[in-house]
């Protein structure tokens, strides 16, 4: 029993940073600051933003995905997987951080900032694929991706419930503020987990990635 508990403890210590990174990724779904979010779309429409303008913003967001796929390999090559992922995530969050304050006078800055943030979001999405490939053993990747997807749905459900509680266009700035708070927490969680992964000194009994399943 003692050796089994030791094995579980070693496994938890080894996998904890990756769990934190997956949790950070999932937190990104706890936000309405997106060019395709229905709550944000309804708010922008209530503020007089035309359907054509919203369509243009969504098209720009789609094109930003191409830029994100160009950006991530360069960040990864220059900084490394975890530092590059952290940079992409923080740039995404910093682009959206001013949104709640700007809503007091116009919805236009929100459209601009959301569009500017998209390449970094796409880059971070690709970064998480790299993280799972590099830090999770092949036999566990499917389970890890599945658990991450479930967590994403739970955070999306949480922001939807908050949107119901804060319904009405006059309360959208508060909802945007909560979204920025969730994004900031995501970036902090990822950075802390990446730092833990980098600084964690592998003891003599550390479990190599390829041997997780034997613990």
Predicted regions and their residues:
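Intrinsic disorder in cytosolic terminal tails and internal cytosolic loops
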Residues: 195-215
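Short amphipathic helix-loop junctions that connect adjacent transmembrane helices
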Residues: 37-54
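A membrane-interface helix-boundary motif in multi-pass transporters
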Residues: 163-187
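C-terminal ends and interior cores of transmembrane alpha-helices
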Residues: 90-105
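Cytoplasmic membrane-interface "Motif A"-like loop-to-helix N-cap segments
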Residues: 77-92, 173
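Juxtamembrane intracellular "pre-TM" segments in multi-pass secondary transporters
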Residues: 1-24, 46, 212-215
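Substrate-agnostic recognition of the 12-TM MFS/MFS-like secondary transporter fold
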Residues: 1, 26-38, 57-76, 88, ...
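Alpha-helical transmembrane segments of multi-pass secondary-active solute transporters
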Residues: 54, 84-85, 144, 174-179
